[in-house]
Amino acid sequence: MKEKLLLIVIPALMAGCNQEKEKKSDTPAETAGLSLPQGFSAMIVGEDLGHTRHMEVAANGDIYASLAQEKNGGGVVCLRDSTGDGKADRVEYFGDFTGTGIGLYNGYLYFGADTVIVRYKLSPGQLIPEPSWEVIAGGFEETHQHSTKPFSFDGNGQIYVTVGAPANACQEQDRTKGSKGMDPCPLLERFGGIWRFSADKLNQDQMKDGYRYATGIRNAVATHWNKKEGKLYALQHGRDQLNQFYPDLYTEEQSNELPAEEFLLVEDGSDFGWPYCYYDQIQQKKVLAPEYGGDGRETGRCEAKDDPILAFPGHIGPNDLLFYTGDMFPEKYRNGAFIAFHGSWNRTEQKGYNVVFVPFEGKIPAGDWEVFADGFAGSDSIANAGDAKYRPCGLAQGPDGALYICDDEKGTIWKITYRKS
């Protein structure tokens, strides 16, 4: 289902450039050390919480964050502010699984471990859910790459689960110079896409009960169902190592920027082309991957694949997506998209480590993207990902319209608020 939505978006977006036109706040005490647009402030809700990945904020303000590694005997950290000062004074850990996906739905806390989606019953007034859990979906194979299971609810009883591909480009020998791509790629049967399940049915199996909603997505850690438009969106982590494996086709500079991190409007039946294709934001087109005979310019079979609605520079790690529906922030942010970029590891100039904003009109971007929250890395220039002080990973919206950001480096959660001058 080829849709040339990308062509509607202004060219500046495709080049991955942005213009920070808003004046930034210059009062570190009011922004908890972050750089934010004028009028916004930040406070630290909790810190040293563990490797916090994604999070949800309940209607009463309680926060639930998934953990990549167990801490204090649990894979979920629960926070409550009982004094009203904005800071969590109660922090509890629970859960038998670690992972990334987390969500609140119909009185349950859902959790995405690497091989199973489970849910815990919430009790009114209680911070910690019931300890027993039920399996919603399982049968996911255990892998050593892109094993996380982030998910989104559509509000109509369905849950959409990312099943990342355990490979770079589906080569006969993964991440090996000279190894050809498998054609057809056998991984696509149960990986490299988004599967849909019933959000309420128990003990579903990926291959028996799941529905492959979209394919050709290498790994989408950031997904969100846009309730206003009734559409699923995702951001893909693009493939790696073009220059390392194909130095005759790609310079180091090209490999730094390519391929794009793709912002996807995911429809039923979408095919975004991985592993056969990638999106080149400089040429503004899908390009045939070198493992499948591409030369960095040829489109070939990729002409039939779906394009992104927006393309970001390569290797900056989009790890969460949130469409803002609150009333606290100025009107320009209403129904626009916030994206948390985890930061790069495989480029000579490290980029990302920030949260950006994309304005929307209807189902597509309506203008240039801009950096919304910055300063997480702790320095304007870092040599590698390990030097970053914080790495943004999760986003959530509070009942008052505040934006929450968590990092998985030091386990810090920030609350971003806005007050008219």
Regions found by a protein language model. Give the residues of each.
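Asp-box/WD-like beta-propeller blade repeats and closely related beta-sheet repeat scaffolds
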Residues: R90, G99, Y105, T115-D154, ...
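Surface loop/turn motifs at the tips and blade-to-blade linkers of beta-strand repeat domains
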Residues: V45-L49, E92-F97, I136-T143, Y211-G216, ...
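Conserved beta-propeller blade signature
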Residues: D62-S66, Y108-F111, Q158-T162, K231-L235, ...
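C-terminal motif of bacterial Sec signal peptides marking the signal peptidase cleavage site
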Residues: M14-G16
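Beta-propeller domain segments
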Residues: E22-Q38, T148, A165-K208, G216-N219, ...
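Blade-level signature of beta-propeller repeat domains, shared across WD40, Kelch, NHL, RCC1
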Residues: A396-S421
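Beta-strand-rich domains and repeat architectures in extracellular enzymes and scaffolds
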Residues: M43-A68, G317-F323, I339-A340
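Residue-level detector of Asp-centered blade-edge/turn motifs that repeat once per structural unit
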Residues: V57-G61, L104-N106, F153-N156, H224-E229, ...
